[in-house]
Amino acid sequence: MGRTLAVPTPYGCIGCKLPQPDYPPALIVFMFCAMVITIVVDLIGNSMVILAVSKNKKLRNSGNVFVVSLSVADMLVAIYPYPLMLHAMAIGGWDLSKLQCQMVGFITGLSVVGSIFNIMAIAINRYCYICHSLQYERIFSVRNTCIYLAVTWIMTVLAVLPNMYIGTIEYDPRTYTCIFNYVNNPAFAVTIVCIHFVLPLLIVGFCYVKIWTKVLAARDPAGQNPDNQLAEVRNFLTMFVIFLLFAVCWCPINALTVLVAVNPKEMAGKIPNWVYLAAYFIAYFNSCLNAVIYGVLNENFRREYWTIFHAMRHPVLFLSGLLTDVREMQEAQAHTHARARARTQAHEQDHAHACPAVEEIPMSVRNVPLPGHGAAGQPECVSGHPKPASGHSRSVSARRKSASAHPKSASGQSKSATVYPKPTSVHFKPSSVYFKADSVYFKPSSSHPKPITGPSKTAISPATSFPKPTTGYTQHATIHSEPTTLDYLEPITTSHSKPVIASHSELAASCHLECNIFDLSDPTSSPASDSSNSAASLLDPTAAAAATVNPTVVTTDYHEIVLIDVDADSDEMAV
């Protein structure tokens, strides 16, 4: 592995090999020991912070997520850059590759910028917790906290990456480490200091001033417990001291960077080398102080520290405790997921009860237009009858017993009696379908309706229940309809009056009546004759009532009415 080449500059010797540094040997030994202690305390202390937060349920909150993130940022420099610094101090120079020097500078930048950004996130979290307590749970929910943490580290990486291209990372013999050389680009150096140090400090200072003002305004010495006041003050002081120590430790090195960047020719030779060394080592020492501050000022952290110390004396118990904690965390997560699933199912059931599912319409009654819908584009009456002036008609019912579930048509083929009940019945409009009281009558001996031939109205005999043709005369004494169940009664018409079918479409009468009507047209009569005969019957109802029924008239035109009595307990049939 070759040595790094020397790069002399007018403002100092950066990258030069110094076999005999101008520091006293005692100072080098002291700094070497201080760095060893810093590395040990950094690794152990920040590891204990992470374990304490993971083991203590009281410490598992959104604010301590950024505390753990700050501990990770502090541990970065103790893992890689600090050991290489010890190596450079031991041999008096840098004998490693250029890539390793670049890695040292990049990881150091991540640690420093990550620390200040996490301290800023902690201050914002404390500010929202104290000054905006009502919105705290919504702002710092578990999901939002993870997003904020990811944004913090993304900002850290984006803030350090420009230094890899603009600022040159080189070995500095004054600090025994690889740093960013901003001497050749003073404007960039000032910008970096403002973004990485000054702006975060202003934000953190604003948050803690607001917090302190809120705490002082909320104090009530007469009605508040002094122990609670002391606990609030200690919780506030813990994070404030963390911020204050970071500002004190990193202020000297940032001030030197700005001074050298503003006036490099004059300031480069006036600043002694030991000032650079002291400034950098104070900044490096800050990485191990946070864990100590937590243990001194926070009772929960201090209690967990003692628990970890006692557990480390018995490694087997310590490992078993860790496994138990991991298992408890998994069980807690499984319980949380189960509760979430149960809550989701409860919401779905409530929604299902609130919005019941609509039953599917059976195939036998699908595509059947409801009354009033199919007549939108066609005339309502095809027989020439005037539209009744009354409102919705009620269904006319006749008492009959069902002897067969499958009535047969004239061709001998049985009709399907399968009926799919629906939660609600269909109510017909008076303009859709209505049968006249004098056109249908029944005989109680049989329940098998048969098609009726003839150009006149359909009549069902009470003796046989077989439809018989009528020749324009209705037998008034055989009418079994109940006029009290109708909203209106039409006069008795002549032989050419027909049931009114809206729009020539099929008719489905709820789930108790299925009517298949064929051959609506009458080849033996014309609409003109229908209209005239209907008018005559309307003018002379007594003549039609006195007429006799001629059962011998046979015609080729018929209307088929299939009656299905589904409900055995019902004594009525809707007409």
Swiss-Prot record:
Annotated localization: Cell membrane
Disulfide feature: C101-C178
Stretches assigned to the Extracellular side: 1-30, 86-103, 165-188, 261-273
Residues spanning the signal sequence: none
Transmembrane segments: 31-51, 65-85, 104-124, 144-164, 189-209, 240-260, 274-294
Keywords for this protein: Cell membrane, Disulfide bond, G-protein coupled receptor, Membrane, Receptor, Transducer, Transmembrane, Transmembrane helix
Main location: membrane
Region (Disordered) residue spans: 368-421, 446-474
Domain of life from the UniProt record: Eukaryota
Pfam families: 7tm_1
Segments on the Cytoplasmic face: 52-64, 125-143, 210-239, 295-575
UniProt GO MF annotations: melatonin receptor activity
UniProt record similarity statement: Belongs to the G-protein coupled receptor 1 family.
Subunit structure: Homodimer, and heterodimer with MTNR1A and MTNR1B. Interacts with KAT5. Interacts with RTN4 isoform A/NOGO-A. Interacts with TGFBR1.
Protein name: Melatonin-related receptor
Annotated source species: Ovis aries (Sheep)
Organism lineage string: Eukaryota, Metazoa, Chordata, Craniata, Vertebrata
Name of the gene encoding the protein in the UniProt record: GPR50
